[in-house]
Amino acid sequence: MTTATEVQIVEARKEHIPFVAWVVMAANRSHLPKGMWDINVGGSEEDVLRYLEVLADTEQLHWAHYSLFKVAEVDGVPAAGMCGFFENELGPVSMMAGAAEVNQKIGRTPEDIAAGWERSKSIMGIIMEHEPGAWVVEHVATKPEFRRRGLVERLVHEMLEMGRKRGATTADIGVLIGNDPAQRAYEKCGFRVVIEKRDAEFERVYGSPGARMLRRAL
């Protein structure tokens, strides 16, 4: 006999911060062993998650802040998450301000900050430009034990509806080259590749040739 599972899509709350930190770490890793935060922060996975938990709860809003996330819960257990935002509201300046807040809170030295940037800066070679007013869907990840249940599709539907209500007419989402399952999932939701960027230094450091941006109308 099987029991039915209950799936709920909820706005992230304070108690979701550890899960949001994991989502940000996992989304940045994509299909690779390490992502930007692993390389920038350094240390163990616990060190990275600790940093991202503080980042998720800064005074400054940015695209890794817990309040921007929606979470899919399966029988009350956080299983998948993603966020959405307008770049003109919460672009790179907001993230830099949030990171500065974290660095101060955890006592990261200027030398540590500079070394982390030196290790991770090749990420700039694949940064995408978004159309004005595009709703940016970011930081998408599902816990391994909850994959293949359609949670990403449900979250994307909710996140796109939020973008429509905010007045967006297009939505963008990114994927690293080589993460074919993620790209297929986004294409299933109506996204199509519009830009591809490759960078040799990014590939040397991270292990992927580059990234693709997908877009769809809302």
Descriptions of predicted regions:
Residues 169-172, 176-183, 189, 199-218:
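C-terminal "cap" of GNAT-fold acetyltransferases
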Residues 88-134:
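Conserved acyl-donor/pantetheine-binding loop and adjacent beta-alpha core of acyl/acetyltransferases
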Residues 71, 77-85, 136, 141:
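Conserved beta-strand in the GNAT
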Residues 134-135, 163-174:
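Conserved GNAT acetyl-CoA-binding A-motif
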Residues 8-22, 29-35, 87:
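A short beta-loop-alpha structural element at the N-terminal edge
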Residues 148-161, 184-188:
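Conserved acetyl-CoA-binding loop-helix of GNAT-fold acetyltransferases
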Residues 30-56, 98, 102-111:
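Conserved GNAT-fold acetyl-CoA-binding loop/helix
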Residues 42-69, 73-74, 121-127:
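Active-site rim helix/loop that mediates acceptor-substrate recognition in acyltransferases
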